Regions:
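C-terminal motif of bacterial Sec signal peptides marking the signal peptidase cleavage site
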Residues: 11-13
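An aromatic- and glycine-enriched ligand-binding surface/loop that stacks and positions planar moieties
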Residues: 15-74, 105, 144, 148, ...
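Conserved, well-structured interaction surfaces
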Residues: 34-50, 71-141, 157-193, 337, ...
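Long, intrinsically disordered, low-complexity segments
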Residues: 94-97, 173-175, 259-321, 412, ...
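Structural register within alpha-helical repeat arrays
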Residues: 123, 130, 205, 212, ...
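C-terminal substrate/ligand-recognition segments
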Residues: 341-453
Length: 589
């Protein structure tokens, strides 16, 4: 089933409650009294979960809000250009969705005798969704009012004076909702991951606890610190939830003769029901009128639908060699675009377009191929789109391969969207264990080693990498490798900004800008273009002093101007502060 039911109620932000027609006393027919009514309502709430839109790339291009993608239409938050209204849409959307969920609880009147396992599992889905949207607001705003009831009954100025909970109180509330969800939900096997389930709730709980635990650790001495540091408590909760998850008998998906095939299949398949690792996913089917345009955009080489963009050299350099050893990004071999991918972690090859890879069906697309240009060979040479136009132009030489359906020719896209994966739980467990100094061979074997071996990377005991990203503070070799693994396993899936924020990683943002591949005159990349296109590239693409692509040098001459004392959180909308005098604005806003 693809959940695309229309929204049932009109929703708006807290400040609009006074203007809305009250719905706290519905007619008898509006109560949710039977299984069909409950299921229909919950199905409508699935619209609030991540999805691919009919236009654009969705989550695939979202990480231009991080150091994984550089875009002409750069992220305002990274560049310190947010203003006091920049959080309004996120605040409104979050509380709109919470109001939807709480309307369900307010009007849930199923007689106890009819509350079978299916009905109770639907109720569990509501608890999951309430937790999901509180978590979204927590990440963006920190301390927030917890919407644990249907607030329309408070639709007076006095009634809406609701103080924010501290961020650790919000996180505890989220985890309590997920306990309720877990106890009510069916297991993943009941609906093959197409509905919210017990295991998905466990992984969400681990992500919540990891986020809060590491936020409280790394922000313990700044203005974003929690009033009470409960870092170890939340990291311990990751371990507790993880131990329960391990008892569910889930395995990482493995298939294919070539390393990386299993990883690629998680993102380029239409049906994920048989991949138990994908705990929750969204299905697309043209026959059911549910489709997207991700395939069409990827086929054209688009990285950001708003304009020219490209995957950064920083992300490419994050991946290990397939033998488990570090790369040395200063090695001359990496000036050769083709050699950059040789002998590397197969996830790099499945995430970034490279020699021999196709943007679409083999019958309609030429594989990427770099070779010195001649008129005789022009029909077989197919380099990155550095000379392209509009949003098909690459700024870095690195296009997205992740999620490309190589059976796609044209028309509607039907590749499925993973929403929650078991791999997220393994990464959370590994990180929490390392932060709590609980790391052991047993934990390594079932987390970091399992992920790398599934990907086709030899697992080596963590050691210090002198070229690893400098976060501005010391990391143990284990934490270094866990952070590397998160970036490799979760690239272009919407996690990177959250990781940078909770790790207090402004050193990776402020004064920095993404760069791209080596494009010196002697490079195979540059030689693959016709003379006319070489001229276009030289006119439009800025290079740094060492001839690496530096496309935003003119636009961001001093790099991103991220405000480390302000931009870790979004501003609470002024209209909410005006209405609710018990709210306090976030630091420096």
């Amino acid at each position: 089933m693809a959940f695309v039911a229309a929204s049932i109620l009109p929703f708006s932000s807290c400040s609009d409650f006074l203007d809305r027609e009250p719905i706290t006393k519905p007619e008898a027919g509006n109560f949710l009294t039977g299984a069909i009514q409950v299921e229909n309502y919950i199905n409508g709430l699935y619209m609030t979960l991540p999805s691919f839109s009919k236009f654009g790339l969705g989550v695939r291009s979202e990480e231009k809000n991080s150091d994984n993608i550089i875009a002409e239409k750069y992220d305002a938050r990274l560049h310190g250009q947010n203003n006091q209204f920049s959080g309004a849409s996120d605040w409104q959307t979050g509380y709109q969705n919470l109001r939807k969920v709480n309307y369900f609880f307010h009007n849930y009147k199923v007689p106890e005798a009819q509350e079978n396992e299916d009905v109770l599992s639907l109720k569990g889905e509501a608890y999951f969704l309430r937790a999901y949207w509180h978590f979204d607001l927590l990440k963006k705003f920190g301390s927030i009012p917890v919407m644990d009831a249907f607030w329309d009954e408070n639709a007076t100025i006095a009634g809406l004076q609701i103080p924010a909970k501290t961020r650790n109180e919000v996180a505890r509330f989220i985890l309590s909702d997920l306990v309720e969800a877990k106890n009510l939900l069916h297991s993943r096997g009941k609906y093959s991951g197409i509905r919210i389930n017990k295991e998905a709730a466990m992984v969400l709980a681990m992500n919540v606890a990891l986020y809060e635990g590491t936020w409280e650790k790394y922000h313990s001495s700044d203005d974003f610190a929690s009033s009470t540091n409960e870092s170890n408590y939340f990291l311990g909760e990751v371990i507790n939830w993880g131990n329960e998850l391990f008892g569910c008998g889930i395995d990482l998906y493995k298939t294919g003769q070539n390393p990386g095939d299993a990883f690629a299949a998680l993102f380029n398949s239409k049906d994920l029901s048989g991949m138990g690792e994908v705990l929750l996913w969204r299905k697309y089917s043209s026959d059911e009128g549910v489709f997207h345009d991700v395939n069409g955009n990827l086929k054209a080489g688009v990285v950001d639908s708003e304009g020219a963009a490209g995957i950064t050299q920083s992300l490419v350099d994050n991946y290990l060699n397939a033998d488990g050893t570090f790369i040395d990004p200063t090695n001359e071999k990496f000036k050769d675009f083709k050699e950059t991918f040789e002998g590397r972690d197969p996830r790099l090859i499945q995430t970034v377009m490279n020699e021999g890879a196709k943007f679409a069906s083999a019958t309609t697309a030429t594989p990427m191929h770099l070779e010195e240009y001649t008129d005789e060979k022009k029909n077989t040479i197919s380099p990155p789109k550095l000379a392209g136009d509009g949003n098909t132009r690459s700024l870095t030489g690195y296009h997205i391969r992740l999620g490309i359906d190589t059976t796609f020719v044209s028309g509607n896209g039907e590749t499925a969207l993973p929403i929650i994966r078991y791999a997220e739980g393994l990464l959370a467990y590994a990180e929490a264990a390392a932060e709590l100094e609980m790391w052991s061979d047993d934990i390594a074997n079932k987390t970091l080693k399992a992920l790398r071996e599934r990907a086709g990377v030899k697992y080596l005991a963590p050691a210090k990498d002198a070229n690893f990203t400098d976060f501005g503070y010391t990391l143990t070799p284990v934490l270094q490798e866990i952070r590397r693994e998160r970036r490799s396993e979760l690239a272009l899936q919407g996690f990177r900004l959250d990781d940078l924020m909770r790790w207090k990683a402004d050193k990776l943002i402020g004064g920095k800008r993404g760069k791209g591949a080596y494009v010196g005159d002697e490079s195979i990349l540059f030689k693959s273009y016709s003379p006319d296109n070489q001229k276009r590239i030289r006119e439009r693409l800025t290079l740094d002093d060492n001839k690496w692509a530096d496309p935003m040098a003119g636009t961001l001459p001093s790099g991103y101007q991220f405000h480390a004392d302000r931009d870790y959180l979004l501003p609470i909308p002024p209209s909410e502060l005006e209405l609710n005098k018990k709210l306090k604005q976030n630091p420096k806003w």
